[in-house]
């Protein structure tokens, strides 16, 4: 090599050495000062969490993209854009107890499906995470609707008033506490005592009143309305009383148009031959019917009302009248609906029921004995411990299935757990002797329900 070539060689070597040194210094700096990176990550996660409304979120190391240095060992070179794009998909959480409402599973009830030759599916509404019933959807939608209209303001000390036989009150009480409201519930004193006990534990004020017709000012719904009107007179703190009015508020059926109906449609792929449900306020059956028929054009899908004994809705659907004028609610000063079943069955037409009444194709009347026997059957054959309204739904689903071709798909609801019906409905089942070992082994569903004429 000539002397004249030495500067060129030296320059190349120097450039290579400088480049390598730069890499080593950069990596070494990062290894020598890991705390700087940790501080940056903590600060970045706090800022990102606040922007997403999720406070206290820490991104686990497992979710960070990192590379290693052969010389200096592990070096974290975070791909910040990658972490940002995956921050929500890396975790599966919901915000608050209201995030546990909806998207309940659709369960095939094997014993009923095998007995009828149809596929009987039940939407497990008892798995809603606030109050454990479909009333969670209604309560949440009524509260959100009131907030949007300025009728409820979080943190102002407002109180939600409602007249209910239990489930709606439990849902309202749970969500009220979660959203910063108080809750005042009026209910008949012939409802299962565990419902009012649960309401007390949820922090609600509970008034149990004697059963009365809707024409009486002492009817539990009218009392709740009056308590809401009296609120500002007895509270000088600037708070207001909001009467939820589940029977007449259209936010009730709209909750099912927005959530329950679409979920059923998605879970069945739109392939269902009948939907069966009871009606108290009427919001569930009306809302689901409106979605399936009016929005998805499933006009061939039969919507069937499941009605307990003592209720007038069966006659309204079948014959166009509730009952004779001498039996009109309010004519006789006593409770008209005489049944062990709670939550469904009524002798008046509510705004919610009327909104979907013309979409209901048929009705099935279910006796208390049939409901009790179905509840026990579901425990013994499917491990489903249900309340009274669920039992009525399932009896009606069986009757409906037997009127359809084999292989038809019938959807109904598992409304709530039997835990809320121990002192009344399930006590009556025990008194009937249905929990005896000999009775528990019944294998003929139709004989058990007194429906032998329906057997194929």
Curated annotation (Swiss-Prot):
It catalyses: O-acetyl-L-serine + hydrogen sulfide = L-cysteine + acetate. GO terms for biological process: cysteine biosynthetic process from serine. It comes from the Eukaryota. Signal peptide: none annotated. It is a single-pass membrane protein. Its cofactor is pyridoxal 5'-phosphate. It is found in: Mitochondrion outer membrane. Its EC number is 2.5.1.47. SUPFAM superfamilies: Tryptophan synthase beta subunit-like PLP-dependent enzymes. Gene3D superfamilies: 3.40.50.1100. GO terms for molecular function: cysteine synthase activity. It is an enzyme of class 2 (transferase). The chain crosses the membrane at residues 9-29. Keywords: Membrane, Mitochondrion, Mitochondrion outer membrane, Transferase, Transmembrane, Transmembrane helix. One of its GO terms (cellular component) is mitochondrial outer membrane. InterPro entries: Cys_Synth/Cystath_Beta-Synth, P-phosphate_BS, TrpB-like_PALP, TrpB-like_PALP_sf. Belongs to the cysteine synthase/cystathionine beta-synthase family. Putative cysteine synthase that catalyzes the conversion of O-acetyl-L-serine (OAS) into cysteine, the last step in the cysteine biosynthesis pathway. However, in contrast to cysteine synthase cys-17, this CS-like protein may not function in cysteine biosynthesis. PANTHER family: CYSTATHIONINE BETA-SYNTHASE. This is Cysteine synthase 2. It comes from Neurospora crassa (strain ATCC 24698 / 74-OR23-1A / CBS 708.71 / DSM 1257 / FGSC 987).
């Amino acid at each position: 090599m000539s002397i004249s070539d030495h500067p060129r060689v030296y320059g190349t070597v120097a450039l290579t050495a400088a480049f390598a040194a730069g890499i080593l210094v950069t990596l070494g700096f990062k290894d020598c000062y890991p705390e700087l990176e940790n501080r940056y990550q903590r600060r970045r996660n706090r800022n990102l969490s606040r922007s997403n409304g999720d406070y206290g979120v820490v991104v686990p190391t497992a979710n960070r993209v990192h590379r290693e240095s052969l010389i200096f060992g592990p070096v974290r070179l975070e791909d910040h854009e990658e972490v940002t794009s995956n921050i929500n998909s890396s975790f599966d959480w919901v915000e608050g107890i209201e995030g546990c409402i909806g998207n309940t599973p659709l369960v095939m009830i094997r014993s009923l499906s095998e007995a009828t030759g149809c596929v009987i599916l039940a939407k497990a509404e008892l798995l809603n995470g606030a109050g454990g019933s479909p009333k969670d959807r209604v309560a949440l939608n009524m509260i959100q609707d009131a907030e949007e209209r300025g009728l409820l303001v979080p943190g102002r000390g407002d109180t939600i008033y409602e007249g209910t036989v239990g489930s709606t009150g439990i849902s309202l009480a749970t969500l009220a506490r979660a959203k910063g409201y108080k809750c005042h519930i009026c209910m008949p004193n012939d409802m299962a005592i565990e419902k009012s006990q649960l309401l007390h534990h949820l922090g609600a004020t509970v008034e149990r009143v004697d059963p009365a017709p809707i024409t009486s000012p002492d009817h539990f719904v009218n009392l709740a309305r009056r308590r809401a009107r009296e609120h500002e007179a007895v509270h000088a703190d600037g708070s207001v009383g909001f009467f939820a009015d589940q029977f007449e508020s259209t936010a009730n059926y709209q909750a099912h148009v927005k959530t329950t109906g679409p979920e059923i449609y998605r879970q069945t792929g739109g392939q269902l031959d009948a939907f069966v449900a009871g009606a108290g306020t009427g919001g569930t059956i009306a809302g689901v019917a409106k979605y399936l028929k009016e929005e998805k054009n499933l006009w061939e899908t039969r919507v069937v009302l499941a009605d307990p004994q003592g209720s007038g809705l069966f006659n309204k659907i079948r014959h166009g009248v509730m009952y004779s004028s001498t039996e009109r609610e309010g004519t006789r000063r006593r409770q008209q609906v005489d049944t062990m079943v709670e939550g469904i069955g009524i002798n008046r037409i509510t705004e919610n029921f009327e909104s979907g009444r013309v979409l209901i194709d048929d009705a099935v009347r279910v006796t208390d004995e049939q409901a009790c026997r179905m509840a026990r059957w579901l425990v013994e054959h499917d491990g489903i411990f249900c309340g009274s309204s669920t039992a009525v739904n399932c009896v009606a689903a069986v009757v409906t299935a037997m009127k359809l071709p084999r292989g038809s798909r019938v959807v109904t609801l598992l409304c709530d757990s039997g835990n809320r019906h121990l002192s009344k409905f399930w006590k009556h089942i025990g008194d009937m002797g249905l929990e005896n070992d000999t009775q528990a082994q019944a294998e003929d569903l139709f004989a058990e329900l007194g429906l032998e004429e329906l057997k194929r």
